[in-house]
């Protein structure tokens, strides 16, 4: 389990993270979402042990991450801005990773080499962005980390490779119980793989819970007629006779209210992660217009 407690970080007087708390259950695929500048990459770099907190702490299975080789040996980190040694090949990096990670799995490395059709003896710096991303996954997953930390993991990949990478992540979770933290702007892809979500804004955690609980506690209802009593309405729009409301309720609770109202038409719809994201940030002075699709 990963725990972040009261984490604060400032840069030159700017507070990037403020008293932030976060919990990633063991074996979870945790999606970290937020607008640009929310502090996602800063938070990820703290969890990866790159940044030192001004205050607060980050632990993996109870061990502090900062300046702790034992804790860092449990995690694999793939940043958005990849780094490889200047003239290093994949084979060079394999030897380097083997020296850092006692858990490095040569058999898995060879197996993944069949999926990632990359030249092993060419300098990685000559690879395209997508090829570099594939190389990073190949090497990092071969380390068999207990915690996989990913910042925009499929950026720069074509649709086929994006699907393959996501499948690789899920297979690793299923087979080895790997815990995954992934930050991405592609909320629809996150929705396909994540079971927990945290929404970050202005250096604070607005909301974190399981995706099922998040989607189950708020629904969208489209209907014709007057708005029934007994609903906590979070947002409303009318287009002609068709009304759409977002309510704080389960689907069953909303259906019970509308059944009693005996309206000529109603439909209860789940909210996507993208809609939840827009709605939750709508309460923090962000645009709400796209929540009604």
Language model feature labels by segment:
Residues 68, 230, 276, 280:
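Residues that scaffold the ATP/ADP-binding catalytic core of kinase and kinase-like folds
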Residues 164-251:
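ABC transporter nucleotide-binding domain
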Residues 89, 210, 269-272:
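Short loop/turn segments at beta->alpha junctions
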Residues 246-293:
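C-terminal coupling/interaction segments
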Residues 2-4, 9-188, 192-195, 199-201:
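ABC transporter nucleotide-binding domains
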Residues 19, 218, 233-234, 263-265:
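A broad structural signal for short, well-ordered beta-strand segments within beta-sheet-rich domains
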Residues 69, 215-218, 258, 281:
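Short, flexible helix/strand-to-coil boundary loops that buttress conserved ligand/catalytic motifs
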């Amino acid at each position: 389990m990963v725990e972040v407690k009261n984490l604060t970080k400032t840069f030159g007087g700017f507070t990037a993270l403020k008293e932030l708390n976060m919990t990633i259950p063991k074996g979870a695929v945790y999606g970290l979402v937020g607008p640009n500048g929310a502090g996602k990459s800063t938070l990820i770099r703290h969890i990866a042990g790159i940044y030192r907190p001004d205050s607060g702490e980050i632990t993996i299975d109870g061990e502090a991450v900062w300046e702790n080789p034992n804790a860092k040996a449990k995690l694999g980190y793939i940043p958005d801005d990849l780094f490889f040694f200047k003239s290093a090949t994949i084979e060079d990096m394999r030897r380097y990773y083997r020296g850092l990670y006692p858990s490095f799995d040569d058999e898995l490395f060879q197996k993944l080499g069949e999926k990632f059709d990359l030249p092993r003896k060419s300098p990685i710096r000559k690879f395209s962005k997508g090829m570099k991303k594939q190389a990073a996954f190949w090497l990092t997953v071969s380390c068999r980390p207990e915690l996989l930390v990913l910042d925009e993991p499929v950026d720069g990949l074509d649709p086929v490779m994006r699907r393959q990478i996501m499948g690789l992540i899920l297979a690793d979770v299923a087979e080895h119980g790997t815990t995954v933290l992934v930050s991405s702007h592609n909320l629809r892809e996150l929705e396909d793989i994540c079971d927990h979500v945290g929404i970050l804004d202005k250096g604070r955690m607005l909301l974190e819970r399981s995706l099922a609980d998040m989607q189950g506690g708020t629904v969208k209802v489209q209907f014709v007629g007057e708005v029934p009593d007994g609903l906590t309405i979070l947002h409303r729009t009318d287009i002609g006779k068709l009304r759409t409301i977002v309510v704080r309720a389960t689907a069953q609770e909303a259906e019970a209210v509308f059944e009693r109202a005996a309206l000529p038409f109603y439909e209860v719809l789940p909210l996507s992660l993208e809609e939840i994201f827009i709605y939750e940030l709508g309460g923090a002075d962000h645009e709400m217009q796209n929540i009604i699709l």
